[in-house]
Amino acid sequence: MATKIGIISDPHATPGPVEEALSIFRQEGVERILCAGDIAGYGDSLDETVALLAAHGCQSVIGNHEAWYLDRTIGRGESLTYRYLSGLPLSLKMEVEGKVLYMVHASPPDSLMDGIRLLDEQGELVDRQLIYWTDRLQGLTYDLLVVGHTHQVFAESMAATLVINPGSTLCNHSCAVVNFPALQVHWYSLSSQPLLKSWNWGMNRL
């Protein structure tokens, strides 16, 4: 029987799109929810976003914005936000329906900044980038690699691994559901906005 996993990334302290993604996941009957990091940054509702993710049992990895937040808030360990973010791992590995899934914010094994960027400004695949990252990811033993960070939406096979970036719930207006063991990816748009495949050129694009 198929298992569904809901995947989000880069909510950037903005709970509205996250809440919408969680509603989609409930409707789709997902069994697990993953977030590829950058819960913090840009937005002004970090506490609400963290509370929402925690209440729904979302498993997340740390992103660069969480690392920066924790550096600025040393000693504030009593808040739910601090406890949640400080407990996030650099990476997450699990087996689902016989498939090995690995999640990291930017790129494996544990980078927070070296993001997998495959698309141009129009959201078109850049062949040289695909070749570059396919070469870099040779030797991975994962069936599915989940990343975030670059605010790009893609699912591309590289070497023996399917690499998925669900995009930012805030910037790309996107989330994904993956069916296991077939590794079929279904995309969903958020905030009554079209899904924006590539967003890297300024907050005025929101």
PLM feature spans:
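Short amphipathic alpha-helical segments
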Residues: E19-E20, L46-E48, T73-I74, G115-I116, ...
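Core catalytic region of metal-dependent phosphoesterases/phosphodiesterases
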Residues: A2-E95
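A short helix->loop->beta-strand "cap" motif at the edges of active sites that frequently abuts
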Residues: H56-C58, Y142, T161
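His/acidic metal-ligating clusters that form di-metal
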Residues: R26-G29, L80-E156
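Active-site environment of divalent metal-dependent phosphoester hydrolases
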Residues: H12-P17, G41-D44, E66-D71, P109-S111, ...
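Beta-strand-turn-beta hairpins that frame and shape the catalytic cleft
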Residues: M1-G6, K93-Y102, M158-V163, L183-Q184
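Acidic, His/Gly-rich catalytic cores of divalent-metal-dependent hydrolytic chemistry
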Residues: L144, F154-L206
